[in-house]
Amino acid sequence: MDARIDQVVTTGKVTLDDEEYEVESNTYIVGDDDEVIVIDPANDAEAVLKAVGEREVMAVICTDGNEHKLSTVLEVAAAGEEDEENWAPIALHRADRLLWRDFFGRLAREEEDEDDATALRSLEPDIWLEDGGVFEIAEAQLEIVHTPGHTPGSVCVISEQLGVLFSGDTLHRGRPGAIGGVYDDLRKQLNSIGALLTPLPKDLRVLPGQGDETTVGEEDARWESWGALARDGEDA
């Protein structure tokens, strides 16, 4: 059966540099009537799992390690299963390991049960994403592209079969992706976006981590003008 893409929009909060920002995030569920891969379950696990329904979650891909994505990842991977051996594998790029450890370390400090706290502190992703890595679901391939800048371990996901680029928070419609207008390493992010877009078909759909969809051609035409954002940041 051919793969399809379901989208879930959720809202939540994320804290960066002691500032709290409200975010509206896109989660994408890729698969068929039986099996799916979930890309960026954010903010609201219940809403994501409702969209998954009775289908089996085969993997959970996080395009970066920011807290609004990690906050639901265990619940979505479990998908109602109590036995951890039956949970879907969680995938994250190793360069965001510090963000992962910081988030679950904070959860551990809030946990009253010491065994549970120890488990949270020792928790690691099941799969470390690598540039060029491929997942398969419902006869579609999902290729990982490392796009550092938004975070050190940010990735995008390309599927030629589905004609789509899942750009996470690396690239939003009309601008480089950011949370609350805050950029981690904008120059590196812009370089990643340029390298990402250049070889891709101009009509390829772009499904971002926040906001409306766009196309490679639309964003490629805007890319050079974004260099002013990086220069302004250096002059500030």
PLM region descriptions:
Residues 36, 106, 134, 141-236:
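Metallo-beta-lactamase
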Residues 18-20, 124-126, 146-148:
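Short Gly/Pro-enriched turn/cap motifs at secondary-structure boundaries
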Residues 2-55, 156-168:
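Conserved beta-strand hairpin/beta-sheet module of binuclear metal-dependent hydrolase folds
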Residues 9, 31, 130, 136, ...:
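Residue-level detector of conserved, well-ordered beta-strand and adjacent loop positions
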Residues 23, 44-136, 140, 222-229:
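Active-site HxH/HxHxD metal-binding segment of metal-dependent hydrolases
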Residues 6, 61, 91, 127-129, ...:
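Hydrophobic/aromatic beta-strand patches that form the interior of the parallel beta-sheet core
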